[in-house]
Design a protein with these regions (language model features):
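A short, flexible loop at the N-terminus of ABC-type nucleotide-binding domains that lies
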Residues: 1-21, 53-56, 72-74, 107
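Conserved ABC ATPase "signature" region
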Residues: 69, 111-130
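ABC ATPase NBD coupling module
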Residues: 54, 68-84, 110
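Helix-to-loop junction immediately C-terminal to a conserved catalytic motif
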Residues: 50
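Conserved ABC transporter NBD signature motif
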Residues: 58-68
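Short coil-to-helix segment of the ABC ATPase nucleotide-binding domain corresponding to the Q-loop/switch region
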Residues: 93-102
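The feature captures the beta-strand-to-loop junction immediately N-terminal to the Walker
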Residues: 35-37
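Conserved hydrophobic segment flanking the Walker A/P-loop of ABC-type ATPase nucleotide-binding domains
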Residues: 26-28
Length: 132
């Protein structure tokens, strides 16, 4: 899976640019790290890539995943997530139970909820992790 950023930049609603445009290609199998002091825009950049910015911000440039432009796709269709530095899980719950918190409230019924969780685990190649 490759990720490419082409002149990606973020501005505020008052037209203040938060960082210089970013151009980078991260090829399949490569790992990249965003580093810098507090307040320089690391989280904002990652949120722009994932499509999680509020309407108070404007994004210009392009985000490509596997060569496909995803810049204007809804968050769910981008298939891009953020791994936070600190765990955001409930340590007393299983992997499956933690994932249940992320399900839409429209998924009603234990069997349907379990099926969606198992499908997500399978997509992540973690199908044996439900009860861990």
């Amino acid at each position: 899976m490759s990720l490419e950023l082409r002149s990606l930049s973020v501005t505020t609603s008052t037209h203040v640019s938060l960082f210089t445009p970013v151009d980078i290609v991260i090829a399949s199998g490569e790992v990249a790290c965003v580093m810098g002091p507090s307040g320089v825009g690391k989280s904002t950049l990652l949120n722009a890539i994932g499509g999680h910015l509020s309407t108070h911000f404007s994004v210009t440039g392009e985000v490509l995943l596997n060569g496909q432009k995803v810049t204007h796709k809804p968050v769910a269709e981008r298939q891009i997530g953020i791994l936070f530095q600190d765990p955001l899980l409930f340590p007393h719950l299983t992997v499956g139970d933690n994932l249940a918190f992320g399900l839409s409230s429209n998924v009603i019924g234990a069997k349907k909820r379990r099926a969606q969780i198992e499908q997500a685990l399978e997509q992540a190649q973690l199908q044996d992790f439900y009860h861990r």
